[in-house]
C-alpha cells in the first residue's frame, strides 16, 4: 500500500514539474507560489507516508489528484507558511 502511495505521489509531482518546465521563463516565475506549495505538499506527504494507516493511504489514493486537491485547499487560506501547510495536510488526512 505504501509503495502505491509513494508511486502515485511521485507520478503526480513529476507530471506537475513537467508541465511547469514546458512554460516560458516568465510564466515559470509567475508560478513560483504554486511551485513552492506543491513541492512542500509533496515533501510533507512523502515524509508522513511511513506513519499513515492503511485506511488513510486508501483515502488519499482515492482522491483524483492528491497534490492539486491539497493545493486548492491551501489557496483558500489567507496566509502561507510551512507549518500552516503541514497542519493543513495533517488535518485533511485526519478527516479522510
Predicted feature locations:
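Acidic interaction surfaces
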Residues: 1-96
Amino acid at each position: 500500500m505504501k509503495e502505491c502511495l509513494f508511486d502515485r505521489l511521485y507520478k503526480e509531482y513529476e507530471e506537475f514539474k513537467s508541465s511547469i518546465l514546458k512554460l516560458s521563463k516568465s510564466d515559470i516565475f509567475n508560478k513560483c507560489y504554486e511551485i513552492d506549495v506543491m513541492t512542500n505538499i509533496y515533501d510533507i506527504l512523502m515524509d508522513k507516508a511511513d506513519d499513515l494507516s492503511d485506511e488513510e493511504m486508501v483515502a488519499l489514493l482515492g482522491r483524483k489528484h492528491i497534490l492539486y486537491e491539497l493545493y486548492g485547499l491551501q489557496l483558500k487560506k489567507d496566509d502561507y507558511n510551512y507549518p500552516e501547510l503541514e497542519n493543513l495536510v495533517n488535518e485533511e488526512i485526519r478527516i479522510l
